[in-house]
């Protein structure tokens, strides 16, 4: 009996200045699927002395970590492994000593990449894992360097690696471990001085959106969500977190709701750098990218990926993996879009992301049926909130889950979420449920002609009297849906011509 061959594994290892990371993925159903993530805090940059020589202790921390990584590499083809060193290994004058033993431990060569190459690879990781359109400014704050990239689609237009990071700024500006206004101001002003040479060229190129691709940005988002804020980072929120940090006098005693102990040590220094970037470049807002350097390395090894629309690729991969009815999901999406346009896509639901989430929910709402029909909505919600979905943020995944949880039968109010406004999420849920009812026969030729009109929160769906008479089951279900929406304060009228 023949055995099915598992898809090959790929490993990307990033020997960073603060942490060493390993990402193990496989290529399946047109997507890169994460199989393992391993991270160890080594704080390599903290081992650099005034002459940029790495201490034996810092090198030993790195070697100990690589001994753990080596076990995981044994089962991965050599051609599917990429290992890179970044800022601290670029800087260390005794890097050859570290690399010689590191190569022996791993059994593979380590490539110490330039700052520009690091920036280019980071951008690839962002482009392959983050949704949205337009020109991006990408910010990645590492342990000893900060990469700044402007790009559009898969093409980078400006690449810069700056010699500042959360570990080096910690040792330089918070050496006394005091969280004072003076230390914060010194760290922020020093970061601005480091950024100044690129200010004119970057503002001349310009950007439409800004994304952060670092542990610092991830930590900030976790804190904001824990404190009931949305996931969008703004200057006001950064200054608010600075004030929270300064309540504690000493860094070792720092406690902020949502901040993990692991991230606490380099949080003030990373926060200072990000505040400087926001102020000098006059950034309005920033969101978290879906990936960065390691993801860029992984996607470079899998040369299939050139599709521009990351979200479309993700949806296609999920539909294939879970054997979904693609024709029907497309039918629901088309009807949902028609209903949205009739309601007023730019007025009744004004947020562009709401339309994206409606389309995605329409195409993936039946994913839970692969587990069980009875609780299909619950299973859909769980899967969409927990699957790796490149192109969608955590808040967007949460919103998708709550929409698909309620795609049929019993209707309850939506809980608070941070992807779009409560009004928009409520309205696209109403449209999703109507689209599913109008397409339940799963054949576009059997769809009725319909017209949806709105009066603020009141919906009126008009259909042919003859069609309703010829389709009594659908007519009854629409009447039930009218009662369900109206009962929770979402008035829905079904009228016939």
Swiss-Prot record:
Pathway: Purine metabolism; ppGpp biosynthesis; ppGpp from GTP: step 2/2. Keywords: Hydrolase. It comes from the Bacteria. Its EC number is 3.6.1.40. GO terms for biological process: guanosine pentaphosphate catabolic process; guanosine tetraphosphate biosynthetic process; nucleobase-containing small molecule interconversion. SUPFAM superfamilies: Actin-like ATPase domain, HD-domain/PDEase-like. GO terms for molecular function: guanosine-5'-triphosphate,3'-diphosphate diphosphatase activity. It catalyses: guanosine 3'-diphosphate 5'-triphosphate + H2O = guanosine 3',5'-bis(diphosphate) + phosphate + H(+). Belongs to the GppA/Ppx family. GppA subfamily. Catalyzes the conversion of pppGpp to ppGpp. Guanosine pentaphosphate (pppGpp) is a cytoplasmic signaling molecule which together with ppGpp controls the 'stringent response', an adaptive process that allows bacteria to respond to amino acid starvation, resulting in the coordinated regulation of numerous cellular activities. This is Guanosine-5'-triphosphate,3'-diphosphate pyrophosphatase. It comes from Vibrio atlanticus (strain LGP32) (Vibrio splendidus (strain Mel32)). The lineage of its organism: Bacteria, Pseudomonadati, Pseudomonadota, Gammaproteobacteria, Vibrionales.
């Amino acid at each position: 009996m023949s055995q099915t061959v598992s898809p090959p594994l790929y490993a990307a290892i990033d020997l960073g200045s603060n942490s060493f990371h390993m990402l193990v993925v496989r290529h399946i159903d047109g997507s890169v699927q994460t199989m393992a993530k391993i991270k160890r805090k080594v704080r390599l940059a903290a081992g650099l002395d005034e002459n940029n020589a790495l201490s034996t202790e810092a090198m030993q921390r790195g070697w100990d970590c690589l001994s753990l990584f080596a076990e995981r590499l044994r089962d991965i083809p050599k051609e599917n492994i990429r290992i890179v060193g970044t800022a601290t290994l670029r800087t260390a004058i005794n890097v050859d000593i570290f690399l010689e033993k590191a190569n022996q431990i791993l059994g593979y060569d380590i490539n110490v990449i330039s700052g520009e190459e690091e920036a280019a690879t980071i951008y690839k990781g962002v482009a392959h894992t983050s949704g949205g359109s337009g020109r991006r400014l990408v910010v990645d704050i590492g342990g000893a360097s900060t990469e700044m990239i402007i790009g559009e689609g898969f093409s980078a237009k400006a690449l810069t690696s700056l010699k500042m990071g959360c570990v080096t700024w910690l040792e330089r500006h918070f050496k006394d471990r005091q969280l004072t206004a003076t230390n914060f101001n010194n760290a922020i002003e020093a970061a601005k001085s480091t950024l100044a040479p690129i200010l004119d060229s970057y503002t001349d190129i310009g950007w439409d959106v800004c994304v952060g691709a670092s542990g610092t940005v991830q930590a900030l988002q976790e804190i904001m969500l824990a404190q009931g804020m949305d996931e969008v980072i703004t200057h006001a929120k950064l200054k608010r977190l600075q004030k929270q940090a300064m309540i504690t006098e000493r860094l070792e005693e720092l406690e902020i709701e949502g901040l993990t102990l692991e991230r606490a040590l380099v949080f003030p220094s990373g926060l200072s750098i990000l505040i400087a970037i926001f102020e000098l470049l006059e950034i309005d807002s920033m969101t978290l990218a879906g990936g960065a350097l390691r993801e860029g390395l992984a996607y470079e090894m899998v040369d299939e990926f050139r599709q521009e629309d990351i979200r479309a690729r993700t949806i296609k991969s999920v539909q294939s993996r879970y054997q979904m009815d693609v024709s029907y999901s497309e039918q629901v999406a088309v009807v949902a879009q028609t209903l949205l346009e009739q309601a007023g896509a730019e007025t009744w639901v004004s947020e562009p992301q709401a339309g994206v989430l409606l389309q995605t929910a329409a195409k993936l709402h039946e994913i839970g049926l692969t587990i069980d029909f009875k609780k299909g909505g619950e299973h859909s919600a769980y899967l969409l909130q927990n699957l790796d979905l490149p192109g969608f943020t955590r808040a967007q995944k949460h919103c998708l889950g709550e929409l698909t949880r309620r795609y049929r039968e019993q209707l309850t109010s939506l809980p608070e979420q941070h992807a779009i406004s409560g009004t928009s999420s409520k309205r696209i849920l109403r449209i999703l449920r109507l689209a599913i009812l109008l397409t339940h026969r799963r054949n576009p030729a059997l769809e009725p002609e319909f017209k949806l009109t709105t009066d603020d929160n009141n919906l009126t769906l008009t259909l042919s009297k003859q069609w309703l008479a010829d389709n009594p089951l659908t007519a009854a279900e629409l009447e039930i849906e009218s009662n369900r929406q109206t009962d929770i304060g979402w008035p829905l009228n079904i009228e016939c011509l």
